[in-house]
């Protein structure tokens, strides 16, 4: 339901530079303007040699493969999906590596354009630096956007009428016995 970008520095010039970098990265990311960047960061096909199978690669894709290989993460995700099957809390924000390759560049751009807009944001500053300077920095980014009505309402999960049992599987670690690997 949110993405947080905390920025801090004891050096005021560094802080202002970081705010510029973060605002630019959030509201003007290269991956929504350049399909090659989307492919590098998200996912793409890769062929190391002609005699091997084509594989999926990408920064996010590889990170999520790592997340999905941890028994703790697998079981926590299964619990979240079982508890919240009807709203966003049951969905993994990083993406399921088996589904990530189905995301098109256009779908990604549309999602970013809808939800990563200043009209759908909250910004806080804390500190004893000049408030006017902060507002000038924000204005330099926000002035180019028009206000949009964005429905980012998250529906309430319906109550369960009976107990729910979830059985999930995951890959046991190397050297572990599958039947004794993990219980939670």
Locate the predicted segments by residue.
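Charge-rich, well-structured scaffold segments of protease-associated domains
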Residues: 1-183
């Amino acid at each position: 339901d949110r993405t947080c970008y905390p920025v801090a520095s004891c050096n005021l010039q560094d802080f202002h530079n970081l705010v510029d970098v973060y605002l630019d990265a959030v509201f003007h990311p290269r991956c929504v303007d350049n399909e090659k960047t989307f492919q590098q960061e998200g996912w793409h096909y890769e062929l190391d040699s002609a005699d091997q199978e084509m594989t999926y690669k990408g920064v996010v894709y590889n990170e999520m493969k790592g997340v999905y290989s941890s028994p703790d993460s697998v079981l926590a995700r299964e619990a979240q999906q079982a508890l919240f099957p009807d709203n966003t809390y049951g969905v993994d924000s990083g993406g399921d590596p088996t589904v990530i390759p189905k995301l098109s560049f256009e779908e990604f751009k549309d999602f970013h354009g809808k939800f990563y807009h200043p009209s759908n944001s909250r910004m806080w500053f804390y500190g004893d630096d000049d408030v006017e300077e902060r507002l000038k920095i924000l204005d330099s980014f926000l002035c180019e956007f028009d206000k949009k009505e964005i429905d980012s309402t998250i529906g309430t999960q319906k109550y369960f009428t009976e107990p729910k049992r979830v059985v999930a599987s995951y890959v046991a670690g190397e050297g572990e016995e599958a039947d004794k690997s993990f219980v939670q």
